[in-house]
């Protein structure tokens, strides 16, 4: 199980690197879908099956629609692929950054970090992942509303910046 989790975590880091190198909106959206899927599988591996399912459905329902809308508005006839030299340079830079940070912080910090969700399930009335979701929506409701407004504002700012002084990459709809 440890090797499967290590493989999933490496896949998640590589997916985040593919999103951060951001060659084109199309490839970035694909990378984000892969990172969300692998992250939800990591959550399921640690016992949070309900939370990972809810997060994945929210991601597919909300964020993928936003990415499809942005990709439809981005008029890019020749998108940059991952095989081009500029993108490969940024991918190698991010890989070196991850390896350097991992070697710098290597030590015993990870021993208490990977505790399964239902380790003390005998003493609990509610399952830990559904109780955590209820707590997130009850006490963190205001933060969720603020986060949604910030995401909407970010979308509008990005769409305005791509337009620029002239038409830019924004097509007339």
From Swiss-Prot:
Subcellular location, principal: mitochondrion
Transmembrane residue ranges: 1-21, 25-45, 53-73, 87-107, 139-159
GO cellular component, one term: mitochondrial membrane
Pfam families reported for this sequence: Oxidored_q3
Organism: Gadus morhua (Atlantic cod)
Topology of the protein relative to the lipid bilayer: Multi-pass membrane protein
Top enzyme class: translocase
GO molecular function, one term: NADH dehydrogenase (ubiquinone) activity
EC number: 7.1.1.2
InterPro entries noted in UniProt: ComplexI_Subunit6, NADH_UbQ/plastoQ_OxRdtase_su6
Function: Core subunit of the mitochondrial membrane respiratory chain NADH dehydrogenase (Complex I) that is believed to belong to the minimal assembly required for catalysis. Complex I functions in the transfer of electrons from NADH to the respiratory chain. The immediate electron acceptor for the enzyme is believed to be ubiquinone.
Family, similarity comment: Belongs to the complex I subunit 6 family.
Signal sequence annotation: none
Official protein name in the record: NADH-ubiquinone oxidoreductase chain 6
Catalytic activity: a ubiquinone + NADH + 5 H(+)(in) = a ubiquinol + NAD(+) + 4 H(+)(out)
Presence of keyword NAD: yes
UniProt keyword terms in alphabetical order: Electron transport, Membrane, Mitochondrion, NAD, Respiratory chain, Translocase, Transmembrane, Transmembrane helix, Transport, Ubiquinone
Location(s), subcellular: Mitochondrion membrane
């Amino acid at each position: 199980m440890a090797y499967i989790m290590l493989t999933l975590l490496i896949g998640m880091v590589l997916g985040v690197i593919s999103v951060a190198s951001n060659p084109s909106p199309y490839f970035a959206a694909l990378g984000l879908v892969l990172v969300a899927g692998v992250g939800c599988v990591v959550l399921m591996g640690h016992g949070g099956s309900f939370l990972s399912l809810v997060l994945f459905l929210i991601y597919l329902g909300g964020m993928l629609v936003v990415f499809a809308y942005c990709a439809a508005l981005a008029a890019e006839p020749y998108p940059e692929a991952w095989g081009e030299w500029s993108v490969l340079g940024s991918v190698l830079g991010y890989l070196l950054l991850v390896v350097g940070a991992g070697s710098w912080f290597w030590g015993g910090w990870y021993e208490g970090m990977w505790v399964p969700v239902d380790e003390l399930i005998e003493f609990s009335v509610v399952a830990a992942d559904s109780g955590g979701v209820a707590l997130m929506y009850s006490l963190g409701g205001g933060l969720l509303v603020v986060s949604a407004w910030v995401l909407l504002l970010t979308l509008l700012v990005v769409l305005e910046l791509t337009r620029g002084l002239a038409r830019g990459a924004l097509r007339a709809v």
